[in-house]
From Swiss-Prot:
InterPro entries documented for this protein: ATPase_NBD (IPR043129), Heat_shock_70_CS (IPR018181), Hsp_70_fam (IPR013126), YegD-like (IPR042054)
PANTHER family on file: HEAT SHOCK PROTEIN 70KDA
Keyword Chaperone: yes
One of the GO biological process terms: protein refolding
Protein encoded by which gene: yegD
Molecular function GO labels: ATP binding; ATP hydrolysis activity; ATP-dependent protein folding chaperone; heat shock protein binding; protein folding chaperone
One cellular component (GO) term of this entry: cytosol
Name of the protein in its database record: Uncharacterized chaperone protein YegD
UniProt organism field: Escherichia coli (strain K12)
Keywords: ATP-binding, Chaperone, Nucleotide-binding
Length: 450
């Protein structure tokens, strides 16, 4: 049996075809979405959990070496890896919030797959993280289906990483493919996420149109200009319908990070001075919220940075504020900070102003954020998104008849307004912002596996 599988940066979902239409399966708490989050007692617990409780093979030298190190470490630290040691989605978030110092938590592992400079052991670790999530998702889907799931079309962005090009894309897709096969999928095919989203929209068209698909996901923005219509449906070879592509590693997570940095970090002393009037360095505050940047997070949570924060508290004109950043370092609160910014971003799609409260840092710590403040904070990532739109159009040398806007950030009035200003007079259509890619992947699975 085949599925469409959106292994997303923000959320994961799965769809099957029923009576000619995509049907999304339940993933968690009666929702079709599973937030892309995972937690365990230690990162080493994930590798042992796969082997001990799910008989997932360690296929090559690096994964075997990782498994041996993991088992040895867990034994030395007296960590008993049980079947419930690894949690996913909102369940993992709840565990992390309950005890951030004792829980190893990762959000959006897909964000890291195309990173340059990854060592073989890091690639092996990310493969295990992805495999664990895919295994869990496959089990959730399998419980709702009568036949064994053996085939999947998995979505992928145009570019996994802003830098690195083909090498980064090859690395990231390789991790996804190996992880999927270890998780039990016999046949794996990849499809570009904006193309998949467009396929779902195409099912509604009665005539051929040039459709600009703008897919703003959690970790990437992908744009494709496509010829779509009844005559293209069910064609296995659609090369002639793909007029132009572009993609970059800017997505909803980057919007959340930018909002946290601009509006929340000043509460924690960013922009302050020493007693001598010297500006405090900005980098520790940026690294604290850059949750999709492995080197930045490693640097922030290093012991060297802990010593730097001690020095900053000692020298700052407002040491009580910098001490709050020190608490983020000590209790590993980066994800909670960015999550608070995300909640404000969502609220500002329907209200003019919202209150950001950070009681997990300090009871009275709060600030008001307006839509104008949001627009100012997001100006740089929004500019990058619009650059990708223009790049796809330049690549195609054609103008769209319609814009199909999708992805988790598609609901933002700021993005719709910016697109309307960039391409005046062109209608903007939308669908299921969180499910269109998955639905399109299921449609493509029916074409390639039928």
């Amino acid at each position: 049996m085949f599925i469409g599988f959106d292994y997303g940066t923000a959320n994961c979902s799965v769809a099957v075809m029923r009576d000619g239409k995509p049907h999304l399966l339940k993933m968690e708490n009666d929702s079709t979405l599973l937030p892309s989050m995972l937690c365990a007692p230690t990162r080493e617990a994930v590798s042992e959990w796969l082997y001990r409780h799910h008989d997932v093979p360690a296929d090559d030298d690096e994964t075997q070496a990782l498994l041996r190190r993991a088992i040895r470490y867990n034994r030395e630290e007296d960590i008993d890896v049980t079947a419930k040691s690894v949690q996913f989605g909102l369940s993992s978030l709840a565990q992390y919030i309950d005890d951030p110092e004792e829980v190893w938590f990762v959000k959006s592992p897909k964000s890291f797959l195309g990173a340059s400079g990854l060592k073989p052991q890091q690639v092996a670790l990310f493969e295990d993280l992805v495999c664990a999530m895919m295994l869990h998702i496959r089990q959730q889907a399998q419980a709702q289906l009568p036949e064994a799931i053996t085939q999947a079309v998995i979505g992928r962005p145009i570019n996994f990483q802003g830098l690195g090009g083909d090498e980064a894309n090859t690395q990231a897709q390789g991790i996804l493919e190996r992880a999927a096969k270890r998780a039990g999928f016999r046949d794996v095919v990849f499809q570009y996420e904006p193309v998949a989203a467009g396929l779902d929209y195409e099912a509604t068209l009665q005539e051929e149109k040039r459709v600009l698909v703008v897919d703003i996901g959690g970790g990437t923005t992908d744009c494709s200009l496509l010829l779509m219509g009844p005559q293209w449906r069910s064609r296995l070879d659609r090369e002639a319908s793909l007029l132009g592509h572009s993609g970059c590693r800017i997505g909803g997570n980057d919007l959340d990070i930018a909002l946290a940095f601009k509006n929340l970090m000043p509460l924690l002393g960013m922009g302050g001075e020493t007693e001598k009037g010297i500006a405090l360095p900005i980098l520790p505050w940026w690294n604290a919220v850059a949750i999709n940047d492995v080197p930045a997070q490693s640097d922030f949570y290093s012991s060297a940075n802990g010593r730097l924060l001690n020095d900053l508290v000692r020298d700052a004109r407002e040491p009580e504020k910098v001490a709050l950043l020190q608490k983020v370092w000590r209790q590993r609160l980066s994800y909670r900070l960015v999550r608070s910014a995300e909640e404000c971003k969502i609220a500002l799609s329907s209200v003019a102003e919202t209150r950001a409260s950070l009681p997990f840092i300090s009871n009275e710590l709060a600030t008001l954020i307006s839509q104008r403040g949001l627009e100012s904070a997001l100006s740089q990532p929004l500019t990058r998104i619009l650059e990708q739109v223009q790049l796809a159009l330049d690549n195609a040398q054609e103008k769209p008849d319609v814009i199909y806007l999708t992805g988790g950030s598609a609901r933002s009035p700021l993005i719709k307004k910016a697109l309307a200003e960039q391409l005046p007079g062109i209608p903007i259509a939308g669908g299921d912002d969180f499910g269109s890619v998955t639905a399109g992947l299921a449609r493509w699975a029916e074409v390639v596996f039928r």
